[in-house]
Amino acid sequence: MKVVILDTGCANLSSVTYAVQRLGYTPVVSREAEIVLQADKLFLPGVGTAQAAMNQLEERDLIALIKACTQPVLGICLGMQLLGTHSDESGGIPTLGIVDTPVKKMIDHGLPLPHMGWNQVIPKAGHRLFRDIDDGAYFYFVHSYAMPVCENTIAQANYGEAFTAALEKDNFFGVQFHPERSGAAGAQLLKNFLEM
């Protein structure tokens, strides 16, 4: 199986690579259209700001390439947020528009931002991305922006208010948390995605 991690120029490429390698796969980090389109599974990692990430995608000619993908794609953290229509960051940053929902700045509700640390994730019952993961398992988050709960939400978490922790739209999946930093539950989620 060809596993590709999209070279978005972001900082968590190596941690995602190592997490996939620990599961027995040999991922390739690439931004070459031919390699990306031939992938059986594709990871879209991202950390930092939506503006910087979209600039990187545009500079690397990846926007149309991502939208053309028909294989399963997993967006991680900012990679998931980029699947939405836009981010409220910096007055509004257009993103990929795969999921018809914006990403909004989290309201602090007296809690510190960014939301950083372990939080419980509640998936839709029986969803294949969460197969063999205990109900109410904890995953590791680092973010100040979040996608509201929407029709594509397959799991949610709460930090002052509910937000989308995972989503699915056609062949696109996204997780707001970092599975590569979430211990056994995160490893199982990556395994589930890779075995789809």
Swiss-Prot record:
Pathway assigned to this chain's UniProt record: Amino-acid biosynthesis; L-histidine biosynthesis; L-histidine from 5-phospho-alpha-D-ribose 1-diphosphate: step 5/9
Catalytic activity: 5-[(5-phospho-1-deoxy-D-ribulos-1-ylimino)methylamino]-1-(5-phospho-beta-D-ribosyl)imidazole-4-carboxamide + L-glutamine = D-erythro-1-(imidazol-4-yl)glycerol 3-phosphate + 5-amino-1-(5-phospho-beta-D-ribosyl)imidazole-4-carboxamide + L-glutamate + H(+); L-glutamine + H2O = L-glutamate + NH4(+)
Pfam families noted in UniProt: GATase (PF00117)
EC number annotated for this UniProt entry: 4.3.2.10, 3.5.1.2
Record InterPro entries: Class_I_gatase-like, GATASE, Imidazole-glycPsynth_HisH
PROSITE patterns on file: GATASE_TYPE_1
Subunit structure: Heterodimer of HisH and HisF.
Record-given protein name: Imidazole glycerol phosphate synthase subunit HisH
Source species of the chain: Pectobacterium atrosepticum (strain SCRI 1043 / ATCC BAA-672)
Organism phylogeny: Bacteria, Pseudomonadati, Pseudomonadota, Gammaproteobacteria, Enterobacterales
